[in-house]
Amino acid sequence: MDTCGVGYVALGEADPVGSMIVVDSPGQEELSQLDVKASETSGVEASIEMSLPPPLPGFEDSSDRRLPPDQESLTRLEQQDLSSEMSKVSNTRASKPSGRRGGRTARGAKRPQQRKPPSTPLVPGLLDQSNPLSTPMPKKRSQKSKGDLLLLKLSKGLDQPESPHPKRPPEDFETPSGERPRRRAAQVALLYLQELAEELSTALPAPPLSGPKSPKVSSPTKPKKTRQASSQGEEDGSARDEDFVLQVEGEDEEESEAPSENSSDPEPVAPRSTPRGPAAGKQKPHCRGMAPNGLPNYIMAPVWKCLHLTKDLREQHHSFWEFAEWIPVAWKWQLLSELEAAPYLPQEEKSPLFSVQREGIPEDGTIYRINRFSSITAHPERWDVSFFTGGPLWALDWCPVPEGSAASQYVALFSSPDMNETHPLSQLHSGPGLLQLWGLGTLQQESCPGNRAHFVYGIACDSGCIWDLKFCPSGAWEHPETLRKAPLLPRLGLLALACSDGKVLLFSLPHPEALLAQQPPDAMKPAIYKVQCLATLQVGSVQASDPSECGQCLSLAWMPTRPHHHLAAGYYNGMVVFWNLPTNSPLQRIRLSDGSLKLYPFQCFLAHDQAVRTIQWCKANSHFLVSAGSDRKIKFWDLRRPYEPINCIKRFLSTELSWLLPYNGVTVAQDNCYASYGLCGIHYIDAGYLGFKAYFTAPRKGTVWSLSGSDWLGTVAAGDISGELIAAILPDMASNPINVKKPAERRFPIYKADLIPYQDSPEDQDYSSTSSETPNPPKARTYTETINHHYLLFQDTDLSSFHNLLRREPMLRMQEGEGHSQLCLDRLQLEAIHKVRFSPNLDSYGWLVSGGQSGLVRIHFVRGLTSPLAHRVQLESRANFNAMFQPSFPTEGPGFSPSSHCLLPNP
């Protein structure tokens, strides 16, 4: 028997005996309240009885007569009235029943057994004449709740037997033609509206024989909740309204199969093709196609991105003029005679024999041997330049110039005086050495350099080996035509040297034109000067200063953002030391008798257990620094909290690292002594903020001695012990590099140096037929033995274009060497590359300088990575530089205002 608002109907024949289940009746107070309502509804039920339609043929009662109700019937009528009112309250506040048919309700109450339905179905809307108080039974598609069962027991009376569960009406009865199946919630709402209409009207119109067509009740559509969510929502009042919500997806299917005929405004349905979930977001655009240089666009896209980012960040963090009091003075530069300069000069006066083979150009096998401090003319097609420094190269850096200045480019370097000299790191040592400054001319992107690389001047030092040198990133260069009152000279840059005696020396370099104009006509060529440094930076303090406690200074890093006042150094004992260069504190700054300064650090901490091999600042924020030591650890530091590193990674023995401007991580070169098999080479390591895994940039068989990155190109270059110089274009490291496909397409060789033996004298050797497949040369442990029986062969790659790169001979040779490289470590590695540096200047951003054990320094232009976009940026920078240039005039002293300089002050 179903409970539906105003009454109950027993359909068909009933079993004589039903099962009885005792259910607790409602409280006395609640029944007394319902008695009052029952008296109020007696008049309404009388009107309903008068408006009942006549029965259809075949549905009459067998007696065909109406008997007056007895006292027992009246008692049942009162109970039915009470149950009618209770059903109104319970149905409007009933919770959603469980979705399982024939099981327990949401509250866990068991379904009572009811009487069987009649074999002949009834038409909805018609009344049974045998029961004058019967009401139309609305259809039901869900289970009854516990409240329905309670009302059912109350209406039947505790003394009456229960009827079995009625059979389910057929589908055609539950789903009228032209309508979708209605759920129980819609039926309850419809029944409630019918009761309101009965109270307002005295009679109801006779329903049609085909069945009633109930008006649609519009309700906001919500997604169907799960069974667990619906059970939890019974205690929440808002969750009980789920019975009035239709399932969106099920409604869409039913509406497509049987659309409503009597509804003029159908409910809006979401299109099925609309994606949902995370996949509905905007997809990342793909870079398809090929760039003009022959590389895919997805490889070149990070290069173009880095160009704009570097330009914007340099405008924010770089300066036009800093350290105005440190101007070169002519009388501090003492020109040495030939006899005085001899101890500082490298011992080798001639370079080893070498030859150059360029891809795509037939060579005649020319063998070169050049003098010390000499160079060969740039190749007219490939623009590569070579010169000889006289000894193994261990320190190298470009002189920064402002963007758009179109000025001459300079590199400073240090070569060891002896080819066979070794330097123990555990002990301090000093001795003569020569700091060299080379001029490369105006390196343009459109034309071959017109001038040879030339030795400008040298600085004689007595601090031993120079392990590292760094120029001030910006604000130290001024125009060479700036006129100054004697003895002041226009400044080229500020240079810091990390020496093997534990000191850091700071020099103010003048422009070569102004300095060479001060020397007499019969002066020695090349010019070697003995210079008094601006400042000497030491560890310790004023009262306790012992450089031997920290050992040799192995690495330097200049603060990359303006005002560039801090300089960091890494020492052999694991200390990282910081100096404040313009400090006036008497505890950190002492003026010596010769006019120079001695500076002491303002901060230092123990960063590693062993020697600090390299350090780098974050170029976007000077609060962060990274260091790598001989303890195989890479540590990221926040200088505001130096007591603990931000991130510490122990992987391998790092030789050098590079922190590119756009990315939150460093590219690391490694020694192969601790590397896992197949994993030696170049790695990109995230700083820890993004949590990405290490990205294997390029595999190498031997130790990678040097690594350099170009902020303008988003590219790193590395030179190793086997004499191969390669470049790798990094992907966009702002996203996870684990998804990068085909990393082999992102790297390419620049040149490969091989040590080739010859049988007889160099004049009888056929160099044109010699190749890198020559058998391994005999073991030679000294430089003299090596050059007597070997020569160097440089095999250059055509860098003007990268079309068909994967099938070209240099690329195949590089890939073969990555898997089957032959290293001979028991001889002098004359072909090894020790230092590599990309140009940091916009005017020469595609140029790369490298050198190594042989003392030969080579310059290459990676023309294929340049683009018309970069050329437009260069033109804009030149226009801005010319707008800021002012006519120069003599200045009165070192403390002049920047407004009197050739550049306008910083914005």
UniProtKB/Swiss-Prot annotation:
Modified residues (Phosphothreonine): T891
Residue ranges, compositional bias (Polar residues): 80-95
Biased composition (Basic residues): 98-114
Compositionally skewed regions (Basic and acidic residues) per UniProt: 62-79, 162-171
Xref: SMART domains: WD40 (SM00320)
Source superkingdom: Eukaryota
Protein's UniProt keywords contain Cell inner membrane: no
Keywords linked to the UniProt accession: Nucleus, Phosphoprotein, Repeat, Transcription, WD repeat
Subcellular location: Nucleus
Summary of the function given for this chain in its UniProt record: Required for RNA polymerase III-mediated transcription. Component of TFIIIC that initiates transcription complex assembly on tRNA and is required for transcription of 5S rRNA and other stable nuclear and cytoplasmic RNAs. May play a direct role in stabilizing interactions of TFIIIC2 with TFIIIC1.
The name this protein goes by in its record: General transcription factor 3C polypeptide 2
